[in-house]
């Protein structure tokens, strides 16, 4: 079974979940004992982290525009990553194209595909894109959609994306696995075509629907928390992510903050080589 995910963190967790003394098979059926790990090996995990909720999606996903956009997002000096880590992240822009080619090879060999997606914009867009991409290929496709929440005893745990799930937890969600019908695949493929035709700078989930929105759509969250009182950029972004978890990455808010600094709406009170370490306030 080939596992497809749309973010680096969740794909890394899935790789850890694969091949740990398999007890789980397709559609959540178990062979023996407790349901803990997902069968197979790490090489059966495909990461398509194209960030399709942002930017021009009329441009091909394997084109230079998408590569440059991904590098621009990953290439920010955010938390003081080591240089080799930053280089690895930038290289991901090229690796995603190779991952898509690898997926095509697996499908050509008759391997079934299981898509793990959520309602986070990057994941929903990735799922719609993939359904469109699969429309000209014969494939056995299953899906596992991340539920809004799960109850564990008297505790409710809410979820935003698969990146929040530990390697040992993935198998517990296989009860939600279902086959994707041809009609459903066509519906989602058409949804992607509509988004491409619209081609807004951003895509967001509004009232349950994936919708094209302007580039400044999430900026109100910055203005909601940024005041004339200086604050570390890391703290500001952390508060936005913590209090308003809309499935948007920290790098997007960092990019928008930088945009408003250049426009003179936000000022740098105390600069730093590491963007997230600098102190900022309203201009």
What are these regions (language model features)?
Residues 157-231, 235:
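A conserved mid-domain beta-alpha-beta active-site/ligand-binding segment of alpha/beta enzyme cores
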Residues 12-17, 57-58, 123-131, 153-157:
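A short acidic (Asp/Glu
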Residues 28-52, 140-152, 252-254, 269-272:
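A generic structural motif
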Residues 75-127:
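Long, hydrophobic/aromatic-enriched structural stretches that serve as scaffold segments
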Residues 1-86:
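A structured, charge-rich N-terminal accessory region that forms the first stable segment of a protein
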Residues 24-28, 64-76, 154-179:
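Acidic, Ser/Thr-rich peripheral helices and adjacent loops at domain boundaries
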Residues 129-143:
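A short alpha->loop->secondary-structure connector
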Residues 199-283:
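C-terminal, charge/polar-rich interaction regions
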């Amino acid at each position: 079974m080939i596992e497809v995910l749309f973010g680096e963190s969740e794909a890394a967790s899935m790789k850890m979940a694969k091949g740990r003394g398999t007890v789980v098979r397709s559609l959540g059926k178990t062979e023996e004992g407790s349901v803990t790990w997902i069968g197979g090996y790490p090489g059966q995990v495909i990461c398509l982290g194209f960030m399709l909720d942002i930017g021009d999606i009329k441009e091909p996903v394997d084109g230079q525009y998408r590569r440059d956009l991904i590098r621009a997002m990953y290439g920010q000096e955010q938390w003081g990553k080591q240089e080799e880590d930053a280089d690895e992240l930038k290289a991901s822009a090229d690796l995603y194209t190779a991952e898509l080619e690898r997926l095509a090879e697996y499908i050509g060999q008759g391997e079934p595909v299981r898509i793990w997606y959520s309602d986070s914009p990057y994941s929903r867009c990735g799922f719609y894109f993939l359904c469109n991409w699969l429309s000209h290929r014969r494939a056995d496709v299953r899906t596992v959609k991340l539920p809004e929440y799960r109850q564990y005893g008297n505790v409710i745990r809410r979820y935003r994306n698969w990146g929040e799930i530990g390697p040992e937890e993935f198998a517990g969600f296989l009860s939600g696995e279902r086959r994707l019908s041809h009609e459903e695949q066509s519906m989602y493929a058409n949804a992607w075509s509509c988004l491409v035709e619209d081609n807004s700078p951003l895509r967001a989930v509004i009232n349950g629907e994936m919708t094209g929105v302007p580039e400044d759509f999430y900026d109100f969250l910055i203005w909601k928390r940024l005041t004339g009182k200086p604050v570390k950029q890391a703290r500001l972004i952390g508060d936005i992510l913590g209090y308003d978890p809309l499935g948007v990455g920290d790098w997007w808010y960092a990019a928008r903050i930088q945009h408003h600094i250049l426009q003179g709406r936000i000022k740098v009170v105390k600069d730093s080589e590491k963007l997230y370490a600098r102190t900022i306030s309203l201009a």
